[in-house]
């Protein structure tokens, strides 16, 4: 059974909250990709209770990224749930120290699998 830590951000005020889900709700996230949206009701989340302010019930959550069990970040441009070493010059998982620097880094693909531990999401009103 999968267990995920969801980091849900509210772009209106910049507040982020962490929630842990498991069981059937977590299984609904497996196979989803970065950029896809899912209803908060579908995951059994009460956003008003989590954020402590009134949030509409029909609010959706957009997947923005995540990390796997070993801390490797998910990248939207790597397809599938696999872990690969790619040559990167910018973006998630790499901060160049000098201009034009490229480096080979291990990253996770853009699809959620049971190996993912943390999923970053934002509210879409």
Swiss-Prot record:
One of its GO terms (molecular function) is structural constituent of ribosome. The keyword Electron transport does not apply. Keywords: Ribonucleoprotein, Ribosomal protein. The keyword Cell membrane does not apply. GO terms for cellular component: ribonucleoprotein complex; ribosome. It comes from the Archaea. GO terms for biological process: translation. Belongs to the eukaryotic ribosomal protein eS6 family. This is Small ribosomal subunit protein eS6. It comes from Thermococcus onnurineus (strain NA1). The gene is rps6e.
């Amino acid at each position: 059974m999968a267990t995920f830590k969801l980091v849900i951000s509210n772009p209106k005020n910049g507040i982020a909250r962490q929630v842990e889900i498991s069981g059937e709700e977590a299984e609904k996230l497996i196979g989803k990709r970065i950029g896809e949206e899912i209803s908060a009701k579908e995951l059994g989340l009460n956003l008003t209770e989590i954020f402590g302010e009134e949030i509409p019930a029909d609010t959706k959550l957009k997947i923005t990224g995540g990390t796997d069990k070993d801390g490797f970040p998910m990248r939207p441009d790597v397809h599938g749930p696999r872990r690969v070493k790619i040559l990167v010059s910018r973006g998630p998982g790499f901060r160049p120290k000098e201009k034009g620097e490229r480096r080979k880094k291990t990253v996770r693909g853009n699809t959620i699998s049971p190996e993912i531990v943390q999923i970053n999401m934002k509210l879409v009103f």
